[in-house]
């Protein structure tokens, strides 16, 4: 919030953000019990990281950005205006406990779009940088 306050209205052409969803993921048990997940479970359980941003955060984001893409936007529908254009990331994860896709809410005036790229969390990395599409 402090950083965004420094910028004038519509300073950025595009903001792409992936805020914490506020779903209490830090308190959940990971399904897969391999070593990597046990380490992640301990880290996230001991850190209060999954707190959803406030309405003020989104107001400030919209103020400084001409356009925005908010990953996990479906978790913030109570804080954002309805959107026409969503980006759907089909992760092609198959039959498991992970989400099949992620949704990004945008203020871009266009139709919803689907992006397909296999990703299964930390298990799909294989040297690929860990970023959203």
Walk through the language-model features, giving the residues of each:
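Class I S-adenosyl-L-methionine
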Residues: 2-17, 21, 25-47, 62-133
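Soluble or luminal CAZymes and related metallo-dependent hydrolases
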Residues: 49-57, 133
């Amino acid at each position: 919030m402090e950083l965004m306050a420094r910028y004038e209205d519509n300073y950025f052409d595009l903001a792409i953000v992936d805020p914490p969803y506020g779903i209490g993921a830090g308190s959940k048990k990971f399904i897969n019990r391999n070593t990597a997940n046990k380490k992640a479970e301990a880290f996230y359980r001991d850190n209060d990281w999954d707190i959803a941003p406030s309405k003020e955060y989104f107001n400030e984001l919209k103020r400084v950005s001409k356009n925005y893409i908010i990953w996990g936007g479906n978790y913030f529908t109570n804080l954002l205006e309805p959107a026409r254009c969503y980006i759907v990331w089909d992760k092609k994860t198959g039959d498991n406990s992970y989400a099949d896709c992620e949704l990004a809410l945008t203020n871009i005036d266009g139709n919803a779009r689907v992006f397909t790229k296999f990703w299964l969390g930390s298990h799909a990395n294989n040297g690929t940088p860990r970023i959203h599409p």
